[in-house]
C-alpha cells in the first residue's frame, strides 16, 4: 500500500478536490493471490512476493522508487524470512529496484503486522517526517522450516534429536496464542459469534465493492 500526503500526490490525480492538503491518502494498493498451505506458492520466498507488490504498486501510479521516502514492512513468520535474510524490508526493496540508500523498517506484530506497517506510514506522513511511504506485508507459512534445537550446534552425545515445528502454535511458549486470547476477550466483552460474522461479512462486501470498482 502506498500512502502519501495530499500535497505530495496531487500530481497523480490532478490538483483540486475537497480534501485538506494535510490529509493522508492511499494512492495505490495491490496484493498477491492467496495460496493453500503447501500449494502453488510454497516454493516462493515471501521476500519475492513482497518485492513483486512493491514494484506493481509503484507502476500503477507511475511513481519512481526514489520518490518513496520510507518503507514499513510487516512480517510475522521470522523463521521463513530467516532462510533468506534477517532484514526482509531491506532485501525486498532492493529486489524491487528501490535505491540502495532507501530507508526501510521491518516489524513483527503477529497478525497485525501489515496493517501496523500501513499505520506507521500514516503516522510518519501525519507528523510531517515524510510525504510518501509504503506499507508492506508478506509471509509464506508454507516455507517455514523445521527447527533444530540449539544444543545440536554443539553436539548431542546421547539420545534422540528432535525437530521443532515453528508453525505449531506459531511458536508461542509460556502464553496463549492470539486466537485463544481473542476468544477469551470475546467472552469477556459479550461479542457473539453472530457479531463476528456480521463484521466478517461487511469486510467481504467492502472488498467485493473495491474489487468491482478496480481498486484492487
Task: Identify the function of each model-found stretch.
Residues 1-18:
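Short, Lys/Arg-enriched N-terminal segments with co-localized hydrophobic residues
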Residues 19-44, 56, 187:
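Condensing-enzyme catalytic core mediating Claisen C-C bond formation in acyl metabolism
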Residues 30-33, 74-79, 109-113, 137-144, ...:
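Acidic, glycine-rich active-site loops and adjacent beta-strand->loop/helix elements
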Residues 31-32, 43-52, 60, 195-216:
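N-terminal extracellular/periplasmic Venus flytrap/periplasmic-binding protein-like
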Residues 47-62, 88-92, 117-120, 178-185, ...:
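Short, well-ordered amphipathic alpha-helical segments that serve as non-catalytic structural scaffolds
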Residues 71, 75-132, 172-178:
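Conserved catalytic cysteine-centered active-site region
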Residues 108-139, 186-215:
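Active-site-proximal alpha-helical scaffold in enzymes
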Residues 126, 131-185:
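Flexible glycine-/small-residue-enriched beta->alpha junction loops
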